[in-house]
């Protein structure tokens, strides 16, 4: 089985697994020359398929890391425009405690007391899947989105000496699905 794994957040990356073993991995930043480039890693996917002599028809499953994705332009603005990032996150670097503004905004949005984060452009599921289907020509049934935190937990579990045994995995993340 050949799986193409994709993450579209900061440092957008694609990896190919063949029968559970990683056979290739590439980050979009290597091709765009933009550190921590975000969004659908089209160039990285193309490079992997070329390097591994694969075609999209060879891919059995595309696994997307996370159930949500954000617009590439917005993600890269947050990552590379310090003034915008400070305003968006509500943080002054010289006053870290002010970062509580972001958490208060998130809680307010969750309770319906405030708007969601200003300027955050979330892609619809249709837009997100179209990036994959239009690029690779794959049908939607071969694309699965996995919860962001489940992906972290799976990486920790399967990369540990406890793989195959009962184990508790705790993830602690600042952002991701549901946060």
PLM regions and their residue ranges:
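Short acidic/glycine-rich loops and adjacent helix/strand connectors
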Residues: 1-179
């Amino acid at each position: 089985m050949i799986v193409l794994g994709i993450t579209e957040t900061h440092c957008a990356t694609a990896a190919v697994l063949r029968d559970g073993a990683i056979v290739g991995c590439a980050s979009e930043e290597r091709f765009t020359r933009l550190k921590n480039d975000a969004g659908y890693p089209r160039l990285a996917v193309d490079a992997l398929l070329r390097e591994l002599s694969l075609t999209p028809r060879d891919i059995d499953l595309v696994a997307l890391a996370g159930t949500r994705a954000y617009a590439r332009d917005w993600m890269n603005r947050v990552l590379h425009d310090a003034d915008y990032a400070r305003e968006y996150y509500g943080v002054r670097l010289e006053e870290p405690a002010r970062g509580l503004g972001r958490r208060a905004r998130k809680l307010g949005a969750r309770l319906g007391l405030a708007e969601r984060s200003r300027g955050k452009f979330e892609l619809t599921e249709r837009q997100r899947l179209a990036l994959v289907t239009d690029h690779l020509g794959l049908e939607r049934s071969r694309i699965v989105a996995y919860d962001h935190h489940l992906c972290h937990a799976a990486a920790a579990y399967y990369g540990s000496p406890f793989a195959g045994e009962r184990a508790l995995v705790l993830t602690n993340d600042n952002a991701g699905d549901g946060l």
